[in-house]
Protein backbone atom coordinates (compact mmCIF):
# COMPACT_ATOMS: atom_id res chain seq x y z
CA UNK A 1 0.00 0.00 0.00
CA UNK A 2 1.39 3.38 -1.04
CA UNK A 3 0.44 6.93 -0.23
CA UNK A 4 0.93 9.83 -2.58
CA UNK A 5 3.52 12.30 -1.22
CA UNK A 6 2.25 15.62 -2.56
CA UNK A 7 -0.42 17.64 -4.37
CA UNK A 8 -1.98 16.34 -7.57
CA UNK A 9 -3.77 18.39 -10.20
CA UNK A 10 -5.90 15.81 -11.99
CA UNK A 11 -7.61 16.16 -15.35
CA UNK A 12 -10.82 14.23 -14.84
CA UNK A 13 -13.26 15.08 -17.62
CA UNK A 14 -10.58 16.61 -19.86
CA UNK A 15 -9.12 13.38 -21.22
CA UNK A 16 -10.87 13.54 -24.59
CA UNK A 17 -9.39 16.97 -25.29
CA UNK A 18 -5.91 15.57 -24.76
CA UNK A 19 -6.58 12.59 -27.02
CA UNK A 20 -7.84 14.87 -29.79
CA UNK A 21 -4.70 16.96 -29.54
CA UNK A 22 -2.29 14.03 -29.50
CA UNK A 23 -3.99 12.19 -32.37
CA UNK A 24 -2.14 14.15 -35.07
CA UNK A 25 1.12 14.75 -33.20
CA UNK A 26 4.31 12.68 -33.54
CA UNK A 27 7.59 12.50 -31.65
CA UNK A 28 9.02 15.52 -33.49
CA UNK A 29 6.20 17.66 -32.10
CA UNK A 30 6.76 19.09 -28.63
CA UNK A 31 4.11 19.59 -25.95
CA UNK A 32 4.38 21.66 -22.79
CA UNK A 33 1.89 20.76 -20.10
CA UNK A 34 -0.99 22.65 -18.56
CA UNK A 35 -1.56 22.70 -14.81
CA UNK A 36 -3.36 19.35 -15.22
CA UNK A 37 -1.02 17.44 -17.48
CA UNK A 38 -1.32 13.74 -16.61
CA UNK A 39 -3.71 12.92 -19.46
CA UNK A 40 -1.64 15.08 -21.81
CA UNK A 41 1.45 13.00 -21.02
CA UNK A 42 -0.32 9.69 -21.55
CA UNK A 43 -2.13 10.78 -24.73
CA UNK A 44 1.01 12.13 -26.41
CA UNK A 45 2.96 9.06 -25.32
CA UNK A 46 0.38 6.62 -26.63
CA UNK A 47 0.17 8.49 -29.92
CA UNK A 48 3.94 8.16 -30.35
CA UNK A 49 3.87 4.47 -29.44
CA UNK A 50 1.23 3.88 -32.10
CA UNK A 51 3.28 5.63 -34.79
CA UNK A 52 6.83 4.49 -34.00
CA UNK A 53 8.29 1.21 -35.22
CA UNK A 54 9.11 -1.63 -32.83
CA UNK A 55 12.81 -1.00 -33.42
CA UNK A 56 12.50 2.68 -32.51
CA UNK A 57 10.51 1.86 -29.39
CA UNK A 58 12.98 -0.74 -28.16
CA UNK A 59 15.91 1.59 -28.79
CA UNK A 60 14.16 4.33 -26.81
CA UNK A 61 13.31 2.09 -23.85
CA UNK A 62 16.70 0.38 -23.71
CA UNK A 63 18.68 3.61 -23.87
CA UNK A 64 16.58 5.64 -21.43
CA UNK A 65 18.32 5.85 -18.02
CA UNK A 66 20.53 2.96 -19.07
CA UNK A 67 17.52 0.66 -19.34
CA UNK A 68 16.69 0.84 -15.60
CA UNK A 69 13.04 1.76 -16.09
CA UNK A 70 12.60 -0.95 -18.73
CA UNK A 71 14.19 -3.54 -16.42
CA UNK A 72 11.74 -2.62 -13.67
CA UNK A 73 8.80 -2.96 -16.06
CA UNK A 74 9.95 -6.36 -17.31
CA UNK A 75 9.92 -7.75 -13.77
CA UNK A 76 6.13 -7.68 -13.67
CA UNK A 77 4.98 -6.99 -17.22
CA UNK A 78 7.28 -8.68 -19.71
CA UNK A 79 5.67 -9.37 -23.08
CA UNK A 80 6.84 -10.20 -26.59
CA UNK A 81 4.57 -7.49 -28.02
CA UNK A 82 6.82 -4.42 -28.24
CA UNK A 83 4.00 -1.89 -28.41
CA UNK A 84 2.30 -3.44 -25.39
CA UNK A 85 5.62 -3.33 -23.55
CA UNK A 86 6.00 0.34 -24.53
CA UNK A 87 2.53 1.12 -23.19
CA UNK A 88 3.41 -0.46 -19.85
CA UNK A 89 6.74 1.38 -19.88
CA UNK A 90 4.94 4.70 -20.39
CA UNK A 91 2.36 4.03 -17.67
CA UNK A 92 4.90 2.74 -15.18
CA UNK A 93 7.40 5.53 -15.76
CA UNK A 94 4.74 8.22 -15.48
CA UNK A 95 3.07 6.85 -12.36
CA UNK A 96 6.42 6.11 -10.69
CA UNK A 97 7.44 9.71 -11.36
CA UNK A 98 4.20 11.06 -9.92
CA UNK A 99 4.71 8.95 -6.80
CA UNK A 100 8.32 10.20 -6.46
CA UNK A 101 9.85 6.77 -7.04
CA UNK A 102 13.43 6.23 -8.21
CA UNK A 103 12.27 4.27 -11.28
CA UNK A 104 10.20 7.22 -12.48
CA UNK A 105 11.16 8.92 -15.72
CA UNK A 106 13.30 11.39 -13.78
CA UNK A 107 14.03 9.48 -10.59
CA UNK A 108 10.89 10.87 -8.98
CA UNK A 109 12.42 14.34 -8.75
CA UNK A 110 9.84 15.93 -11.04
CA UNK A 111 6.73 14.57 -9.41
CA UNK A 112 3.16 15.27 -10.45
CA UNK A 113 3.71 18.79 -11.74
CA UNK A 114 6.91 18.15 -13.68
CA UNK A 115 6.64 14.64 -15.14
CA UNK A 116 7.99 14.50 -18.69
CA UNK A 117 9.55 12.18 -21.26
CA UNK A 118 11.69 13.93 -23.84
CA UNK A 119 12.12 11.00 -26.29
CA UNK A 120 8.40 11.32 -27.09
CA UNK A 121 8.45 15.12 -27.21
CA UNK A 122 6.71 15.41 -23.82
CA UNK A 123 8.07 18.40 -21.93
CA UNK A 124 7.17 19.41 -18.36
CA UNK A 125 4.13 21.04 -16.91
CA UNK A 126 4.67 24.20 -14.88
CA UNK A 127 3.60 24.86 -11.30
CA UNK A 128 3.06 28.53 -12.17
CA UNK A 129 -0.32 29.15 -13.82
CA UNK A 130 0.36 29.98 -17.47
CA UNK A 131 4.08 29.32 -16.96
CA UNK A 132 4.27 27.04 -20.00
CA UNK A 133 3.42 29.88 -22.40
CA UNK A 134 6.73 31.79 -22.42
CA UNK A 135 8.78 28.59 -22.17
CA UNK A 136 6.94 26.99 -25.10
CA UNK A 137 7.36 30.18 -27.12
CA UNK A 138 11.11 30.07 -26.49
CA UNK A 139 11.15 26.44 -27.61
CA UNK A 140 9.30 27.40 -30.80
CA UNK A 141 11.88 30.12 -31.49
CA UNK A 142 14.62 27.52 -31.05
CA UNK A 143 12.85 25.17 -33.46
CA UNK A 144 12.54 27.93 -36.04
CA UNK A 145 16.13 29.14 -35.70
CA UNK A 146 17.51 25.62 -36.04
CA UNK A 147 15.20 24.39 -38.81
CA UNK A 148 13.81 21.65 -36.59
CA UNK A 149 10.84 19.54 -37.60
CA UNK A 150 7.55 19.64 -35.76
CA UNK A 151 5.40 22.17 -33.96
CA UNK A 152 5.31 23.21 -30.31
CA UNK A 153 2.02 22.89 -28.45
CA UNK A 154 1.54 25.11 -25.42
CA UNK A 155 -1.18 23.68 -23.18
CA UNK A 156 -2.66 26.15 -20.72
CA UNK A 157 -5.91 26.49 -18.80
CA UNK A 158 -8.52 29.22 -19.05
CA UNK A 159 -7.36 30.81 -15.78
CA UNK A 160 -3.92 31.40 -17.32
CA UNK A 161 -5.53 33.99 -19.59
CA UNK A 162 -5.45 36.34 -16.63
CA UNK A 163 -1.63 36.21 -16.60
CA UNK A 164 0.44 38.84 -18.41
CA UNK A 165 3.24 36.52 -19.57
CA UNK A 166 0.69 34.49 -21.56
CA UNK A 167 -0.26 37.52 -23.65
CA UNK A 168 3.39 38.48 -24.00
CA UNK A 169 4.12 34.98 -25.34
CA UNK A 170 1.26 35.14 -27.83
CA UNK A 171 2.37 38.55 -29.08
CA UNK A 172 6.01 37.43 -29.34
CA UNK A 173 5.04 34.35 -31.34
CA UNK A 174 3.30 36.47 -33.98
CA UNK A 175 5.56 39.55 -34.22
CA UNK A 176 5.52 41.23 -37.62
CA UNK A 177 9.30 41.02 -37.87
CA UNK A 178 9.01 37.28 -38.47
CA UNK A 179 7.17 38.13 -41.70
CA UNK A 180 8.90 41.36 -42.71
CA UNK A 181 12.52 41.18 -41.57
CA UNK A 182 13.51 37.53 -41.46
CA UNK A 183 15.29 35.87 -44.36
CA UNK A 184 13.43 33.91 -47.01
CA UNK A 185 12.74 30.35 -45.96
CA UNK A 186 12.25 31.35 -42.34
CA UNK A 187 9.56 33.96 -42.71
CA UNK A 188 6.29 33.53 -40.83
CA UNK A 189 5.20 33.20 -37.24
CA UNK A 190 6.66 30.74 -34.78
CA UNK A 191 5.65 27.06 -35.11
CA UNK A 192 3.47 27.10 -32.00
CA UNK A 193 -0.12 26.28 -31.09
CA UNK A 194 -1.63 27.76 -27.93
CA UNK A 195 -4.18 25.21 -26.72
CA UNK A 196 -6.47 26.47 -23.97
CA UNK A 197 -8.35 23.91 -21.88
CA UNK A 198 -11.45 25.82 -20.81
CA UNK A 199 -12.95 24.00 -17.83
CA UNK A 200 -14.63 27.23 -16.65
CA UNK A 201 -12.70 27.46 -13.39
CA UNK A 202 -9.42 28.86 -12.11
CA UNK A 203 -8.91 27.82 -8.50
CA UNK A 204 -12.22 28.80 -6.86
CA UNK A 205 -13.29 31.40 -9.40
CA UNK A 206 -15.41 30.94 -12.52
CA UNK A 207 -13.59 32.46 -15.47
CA UNK A 208 -16.85 33.02 -17.36
CA UNK A 209 -19.08 35.52 -15.61
CA UNK A 210 -16.78 36.20 -12.67
CA UNK A 211 -13.00 36.60 -12.97
CA UNK A 212 -12.62 37.19 -16.75
CA UNK A 213 -14.40 39.29 -19.38
CA UNK A 214 -13.69 37.47 -22.66
CA UNK A 215 -16.51 34.88 -22.32
CA UNK A 216 -14.85 32.63 -24.94
CA UNK A 217 -11.04 32.20 -24.98
CA UNK A 218 -11.00 31.88 -28.79
CA UNK A 219 -11.97 35.55 -29.06
CA UNK A 220 -8.62 36.64 -27.67
CA UNK A 221 -6.80 35.85 -30.91
CA UNK A 222 -8.49 38.86 -32.51
CA UNK A 223 -6.44 41.10 -30.25
CA UNK A 224 -3.13 39.61 -31.43
CA UNK A 225 -3.21 39.26 -35.24
CA UNK A 226 -5.50 40.21 -38.15
CA UNK A 227 -5.97 36.47 -38.76
CA UNK A 228 -7.17 36.11 -35.13
CA UNK A 229 -4.29 33.64 -34.63
CA UNK A 230 -6.42 31.17 -36.62
CA UNK A 231 -8.31 30.59 -33.38
CA UNK A 232 -10.94 27.87 -33.23
CA UNK A 233 -13.35 26.82 -30.52
CA UNK A 234 -13.48 23.02 -30.27
CA UNK A 235 -15.86 20.85 -28.24
CA UNK A 236 -13.52 19.24 -25.73
CA UNK A 237 -15.56 16.06 -25.34
CA UNK A 238 -15.74 15.54 -29.11
CA UNK A 239 -12.45 16.91 -30.47
CA UNK A 240 -12.26 14.66 -33.53
Predicted regions and their residues:
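Structural signal for short hydrophobic segments within the conserved structured cores
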Residues: 228-234
Amino acid sequence: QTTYPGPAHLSYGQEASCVGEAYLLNKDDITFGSHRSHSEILSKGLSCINKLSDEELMQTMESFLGGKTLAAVKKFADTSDVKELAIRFLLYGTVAEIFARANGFHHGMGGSMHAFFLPFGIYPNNAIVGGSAPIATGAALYQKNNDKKGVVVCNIGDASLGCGPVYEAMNFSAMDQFKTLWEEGRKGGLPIIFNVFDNFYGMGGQTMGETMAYNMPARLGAGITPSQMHAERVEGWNPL
